[in-house]
Amino acid sequence: MKLVTATQEFDRKYGLKTAIKLIKDYGFDAYDCNLYEAMKKGKPFASDDYLKRAEEIREYADNLGISCVQAHAPLPNVKTIEGIKAAVEVHKKAIEISAVLGAEIIIIHPSSITDVKGNYELLYSHLLPVAKKNNIKIAAENMFVRLDGALNIVPGACGTPEDFVHYIDYISDPYFTACLDIGHPCLPHTRPAQEFIRALGNKRLGALHIHSNSGHDDQHAIPFYGKADWDEICYELAKIDYQGNFTLEAYKFLLSFPDELIPYAVNLLHKSARLLMEKIEKYRTEIKNETC
């Protein structure tokens, strides 16, 4: 299991190459390329020669000795049927870029305006052939929906353990997996992350987004802050023998710090994640010993 962190906030402030170097220098094992930043206008992958640019980034990262193991597709507006259809071409491009970078999984959000059948027919059925061609898995993520106010939040697509399991089993493709966002189950009217882990199990759960919140909004905060029961989460990940990576998506935690304190903040983030990974391995060993 590798400790991975997202490029988003570093990319926004310094550019993608510097983001990757910083992630390497701060001691992370690999990086998650956030394409909703890297594909923005003026960014490396917004140009017509995006695959060439991806090859350049891949070579740069390889020379640094750090790999891209995961990516996050852009976030186009999928609140209408036409929006979902328009997102297909954006996501195809994102899949191609991610594969060149070396990612094993790309997270592509389902739309919460339709069910699994609608998401498959409008979105994933068009993307899975591209994923297979490029040998990269697509991961759906557990979503939430804001209703008539910022804090009026309810589960969206894949937003309950049962619905997430249904998505994976309905599409039933070796190139389709689950990315469990640990922060989203802390939000109102949702169920704890450990219930999702138990329901998804080893075969369905392929990736994680590690962050936390106070239970009121999607804050993408550092682990150990907020509502998440990290001890139980680590135990359940060990119990299902989770085989994916440990990917931080706690970028908003860094937003409140001045540049002078960013190294200290990232160091705390890194140490927090390493501690959680150690917990998982400790529980994994204990569980194996109990079954011997």
Q: Model features per residue range: what roles?
A:
Residues 31-33, 69-71, 106, 138, ...:
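Hydrophobic residues within beta-strands of alpha/beta enzymes
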Residues 39-44, 77-82, 146-151, 216-220, ...:
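A short acidic, helix-capping loop that chelates divalent metal ions and anchors anionic groups
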Residues 32-58:
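Glycine-rich, proline-tolerant flexible connector loops at the mouths of alpha/beta enzymes
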